[in-house]
C-alpha cells in the first residue's frame, strides 16, 4: 500500500514509519509512506504557506499554490488511481466500516490542514473525500492522518502476526471486544474466569461472544441498535443482562 502525506510537519510521521506495527510494515515493504511539505513549493525567501482569509476573521488559511503543487507532486509519485483525502472536521466520521473501505485502496494521499483550514477551491479541485476522526478540534490534520494510517495498515495482509487479530478487534463485527487475561492466574484475589482455563474452545468462544455483547450493551448501547443479532447472540445477550442484574442486586443488598 502507498500512502502519500501532504503536511507542513512531515517529521511527525516518523511515529508511523519508525515504530510499532506500521514501522514493521514499512520495514518489510508492505507499506510505503512518503511526505511532501507545501513549504518546499514556495518561491519567496520566507517560504510563506499561509495568508489572510477574504472577508476577514481570525486566523490564517493555507495558501492555494504551495498546497496544490505539493498535492500534484504526491499524485505524480503515486501514479494513477490514488484517492486524495482531506482530514477535516466536516468529513465523514471514521469508523471500522470506513476503515475497511479505505483499506481496499492500494494508493491514497492524505492532506493535512493547518491554521484555520484550506481554501475551499483546493477542496473542490483536488480532494476526492473528506474524513474526520471525531467531533472535536485539533491543531492540524497530522494526528487524524496517523490515526487513519494505523487503522488501515492493520488490514494489509502480512502486517499483523495473526490476521485474526484484526478480525477480532473491537468494532470488527460491530461489537466491543471481550475482556482478555494473561498470567498470573490470580492477581490480588482476582481470578481468571475458569472457562478460559478449561480448554473447551466452544465454551470459550461462547463466553467471549457473551462478554462482547454485554460490554457493548453496557458501554455503547447505540451500537446494538444497528445490528441484527443472530438467535445465539440474542440468547447470550439476554443471559448477560440477567447475570448483570443479579450482580447489581447482590451489590446493592450488601451496601
UniProtKB/Swiss-Prot annotation:
List, alphabetically, the Gene3D superfamilies matched: 3.40.1280.10, tRNA(m1g37)methyltransferase, domain 2 (1.10.1270.20)
Q: Which UniProt keywords apply?
A: Cytoplasm, Methyltransferase, S-adenosyl-L-methionine, Transferase, tRNA processing
Could you say which enzyme class this protein belongs to? transferase
Where along the chain is S-adenosyl-L-methionine bound? 113, 133-138
Q: Name one Pfam family in it.
A: tRNA_m1G_MT
InterPro entries in alphabetical order = Alpha/beta_knot_MTases, tRNA_m1G_MeTrfase_C_sf, tRNA_m1G_MeTrfase_TrmD, tRNA_m1G_MTases_N, tRNA_MeTrfase_TRMD/TRM10
* Claim: Transferase is one of the keywords in the record: yes
Location(s) in or outside the cell: Cytoplasm
Q: Which CDD domains match?
A: TrmD-like
Q: Is tRNA processing set as a keyword in this record?
A: yes
Q: What is its EC number?
A: 2.1.1.228
Q: GO:BP terms for this protein?
A: tRNA N1-guanine methylation
Q: Name one GO cellular component term.
A: cytosol
A single GO molecular function term of this UniProt record: tRNA (guanine(37)-N1)-methyltransferase activity
Disulfide links within the chain: none
* Recorded catalytic activity of this chain's protein: guanosine(37) in tRNA + S-adenosyl-L-methionine = N(1)-methylguanosine(37) in tRNA + S-adenosyl-L-homocysteine + H(+)
Family listed: Belongs to the RNA methyltransferase TrmD family.
Q: What does this protein do?
A: Specifically methylates guanosine-37 in various tRNAs.
How does this chain assemble? Answer: Homodimer.
Q: What is this protein called?
A: tRNA (guanine-N(1)-)-methyltransferase
Lineage of producing organism: Bacteria, Pseudomonadati, Pseudomonadota, Gammaproteobacteria, Enterobacterales
Amino acid at each position: 500500500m502507498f500512502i502519500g502525506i501532504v503536511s507542513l510537519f512531515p517529521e511527525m510521521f516518523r511515529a508511523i514509519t519508525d515504530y510499532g506495527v506500521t514501522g514493521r510494515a514499512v520495514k518489510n515493504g508492505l507499506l510505503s509512506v512518503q511526505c511532501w511539505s507545501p513549504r518546499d513549493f514556495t518561491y519567496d525567501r520566507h517560504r510563506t504557506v499561509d495568508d489572510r482569509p477574504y472577508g476577514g476573521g481570525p486566523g490564517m488559511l493555507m495558501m492555494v499554490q504551495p498546497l496544490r503543487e505539493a498535492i500534484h507532486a504526491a499524485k505524480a509519485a503515486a501514479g494513477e488511481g490514488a484517492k486524495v483525502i482531506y482530514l477535516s472536521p466536516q468529513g465523514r466520521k471514521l469508523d471500522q466500516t470506513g476503515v475497511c473501505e479505505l483499506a481496499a485502496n492500494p494508493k491514497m494521499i492524505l492532506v493535512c490542514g493547518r491554521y484555520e483550514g484550506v481554501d475551499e477551491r483546493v477542496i473542490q479541485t483536488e480532494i476526492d473525500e473528506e474524513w474526520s476522526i471525531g467531533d472535536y478540534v485539533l491543531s492540524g490534520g497530522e494526528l487524524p492522518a496517523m490515526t487513519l494510517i494505523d487503522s488501515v495498515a492493520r488490514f494489509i495482509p502480512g502486517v499483523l502476526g495473526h490476521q485474526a487479530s484484526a478480525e477480532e478487534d473491537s468494532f470488527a463485527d460491530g461489537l466491543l471486544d471481550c475482556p482478555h487475561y494473561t498470567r498470573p492466574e490470580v492477581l490480588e484475589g482476582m481470578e481468571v474466569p475458569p472457562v478460559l482455563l478449561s480448554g473447551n474452545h466452544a465454551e470459550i468462544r461462547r463466553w467471549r461472544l457473551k462478554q462482547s455483547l454485554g460490554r457493548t450493551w453496557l458501554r455503547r448501547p447505540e451500537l446494538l441498535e444497528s445490528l441484527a443479532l443472530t438467535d445465539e447472540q440474542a440468547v447470550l445477550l439476554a443471559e448477560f443482562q440477567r447475570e448483570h442484574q443479579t450482580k447489581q442486586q447482590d451489590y446493592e443488598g450488601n451496601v
